[in-house]
């Protein structure tokens, strides 16, 4: 049985106020967010450790996203918890020395992902695998700047998904990072911050302005 839907504890002004500690927001999210939501936003684990790596903007975004998506604790079936959750918990148990061998911690991810259609939860791409995707990219105002999904039946027959090696910089970083968390058949909505999209320069040829937050609907149809 689903838990009662929590009420918003703070206004936007209170959330951004320095008087509200990050730990309070993290505790609220851990108390009320589902495991998969917390894993997606890297909010699992000891509150003190999470507070060290998560900045205030990321926590405010996660707080608002929790109420937008309604992914509260008890709202998802236990089986919905992905391998990503297990991996996060395993990584927390690793000794700290191993971190020196990895790339420096860059803080929270610069994207959020909402699952629109579940995948098989078995086949996940690895770095260097070729992935095949259908996608539509829009700006925040809803303007479509790119898509490979055809509407006319004639064009549909000739349409092919986008294929590329994932995790090696062939596409924007938001795509590279997000697709590694998706399983075959999954469709997701990605909201990518400018830092992991086209940054300060934008992409004038594609009519993407500077510092643009991009929204994609991506379906991972196959992995080679």
Curated annotation (Swiss-Prot):
Residues 87-119 are annotated as: Disordered. It catalyses: [protein]-peptidylproline (omega=180) = [protein]-peptidylproline (omega=0). The modification N-acetylalanine is found at residue 2. CDD domains: BTHB_FKBP25 (cd21063). Inhibited preferentially by rapamycin over FK506. It is found in: Nucleus. It comes from the Eukaryota. GO terms for cellular component: nucleus. Residues 128-224 form the PPIase FKBP-type domain. The modification N6-acetyllysine is found at residues 99, 170. This is Peptidyl-prolyl cis-trans isomerase FKBP3. It comes from Oryctolagus cuniculus (Rabbit).
């Amino acid at each position: 049985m689903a838990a009662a839907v929590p009420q918003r504890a703070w206004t936007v002004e209170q959330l951004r106020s320095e008087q509200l500690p990050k730990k309070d927001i993290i505790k609220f999210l851990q108390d009320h967010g589902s495991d998969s939501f917390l894993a997606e936003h890297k909010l699992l684990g000891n509150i003190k450790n999470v507070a060290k790596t998560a900045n205030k903007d990321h926590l405010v975004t996660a707080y608002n996203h929790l109420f937008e998506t309604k992914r509260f604790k008890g709202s998802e079936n236990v089986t919905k918890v992905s391998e990503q959750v297990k991996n996060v918990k395993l990584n927390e148990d690793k000794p700290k020395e191993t971190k020196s061998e990895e790339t420096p911690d860059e803080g929270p991810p610069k994207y959020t992902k909402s699952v629109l259609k579940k995948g098989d939860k078995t086949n996940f791409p690895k770095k260097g695998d070729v992935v095949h995707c259908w996608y539509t990219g829009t700006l925040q105002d809803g303007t479509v700047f790119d898509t490979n999904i055809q509407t006319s039946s004639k064009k549909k027959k000739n349409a092919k998904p986008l294929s590329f090696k994932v995790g090696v910089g062939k596409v924007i970083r938001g795509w590279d990072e997000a697709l590694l968390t998706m399983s075959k058949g999954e469709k997701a909505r990605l909201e990518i911050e400018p830092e992991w999209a086209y940054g300060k320069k934008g992409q004038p040829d594609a009519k993407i302005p500077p510092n643009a937050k991009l929204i994609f609907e991506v379906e991972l149809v196959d992995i080679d």
